[in-house]
Structures are given as C-alpha cells and as structure tokens.
Amino acid sequence: LCEVGEMETKEVMKMQKKLPDTRFIIARSGYFINKKNGLFPLLRKINVLGLGSRIGNGHQCIPIVHIDDAAEAVFFLTTDIHCQGIYNITAPEIASMNEIISAFSGNFGLKLLSTPKPLIRLLVGDAISILEQNCKVLPSRLINAGFSFKYKNAKEIISAI
C-alpha cells in the first residue's frame, strides 16, 4: 500500500509543477477509529468471546486517528490557505499494538490473552499482515501548522467510541 501511495504522491507532485497557482495537499492518514469501519471492526473480530488479543509481538507502532480528528484535520488543511504539501493525519502520540489492545480491552472489559496467529488470520484475513508492520508516523507538519487534536492517544481515542 505504501508503495502505491508513494507512486501517487510523485504523480501529484508532477502535476503541481504544471499548475503552480494551485495548492496541493496530500493527506496520509492512520487507521481510522470509529464504530462502523476502520480498525475498530478488526479489533472487535479479534477480541471475540470476551478475550483481548494483540497482533504480532505487540511492540509495533500502529498509526491511528479518531475519525472526528481526521475529518477536522482535512477541513483545517483545505481551509487554511497556508497549508500545502504532504501532511500525516495520525494521533500525535505514537501507539503500540499493546497500548491499543490494552485500551480496547479496558474500555470493553475484556481479559487479555494471546491468541494463536492462525486463529487471528481466520478472523481478519490478510489484514493481519498490515497490522504486524511497524509504522512510526507523527503529524508534525499538521501540528506545526496550528492544528490541535481532540484525541491524542490510544486510550483517549478508544474511550471516545
């Protein structure tokens, strides 16, 4: 996915050279957290039967963002005429899989246990391979532009669901 995204980014940057009076914004988002889609349904599938389970070793960083913050960030970027270029839309505090699962389990009263990888793969399919990757992403440019997140970390994001 990242390779495809980078190829698209290069294409947009080429277009920007042809249209110098046009403001281009590329928003890279983390996994959205809300009740209906994004990362939440995957976590719900993995944590069936009242058991919380992490994916991978639990130390990998997972870029997440509350859907409300993501929507506000896009609005901010499109309405602030000084914003252009590439922006990461992720929570300002990096979250590990362990932190996400702990917050999820604590919020929904689940017991944390290890679940065998084949069972998790059966529940979520190929999404497991994406969630096993370590991806440390911060929204530095977005914050420096003046954007303020309502939900800053995994606990705040998941508690708001």
PLM features: residue spans?
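Alpha-helical membrane-targeting segments
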Residues: 42-63, 106-136
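Non-catalytic, hydrophobic alpha-helical segments
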Residues: 70, 74, 89, 100, ...
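Residue-level signal for the nucleotide or nucleotide-sugar donor/cofactor binding architecture
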Residues: 34, 62-68, 95, 137, ...
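C-terminal amphipathic/interface module of NAD(P)-dependent oxidoreductases
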Residues: 110, 129-161
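Mid/C-terminal beta-alpha module of Rossmann-like enzyme folds, strongest
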Residues: 80-126
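Hydrophobic "lid"/C-terminal helical patch
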Residues: 74-78, 104, 158-161
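NAD(P)-dependent short-chain dehydrogenase/reductase
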Residues: 7-16, 23-26, 30-61
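Alpha-helical substrate-binding/gating segment
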Residues: 44-53, 59-89, 94
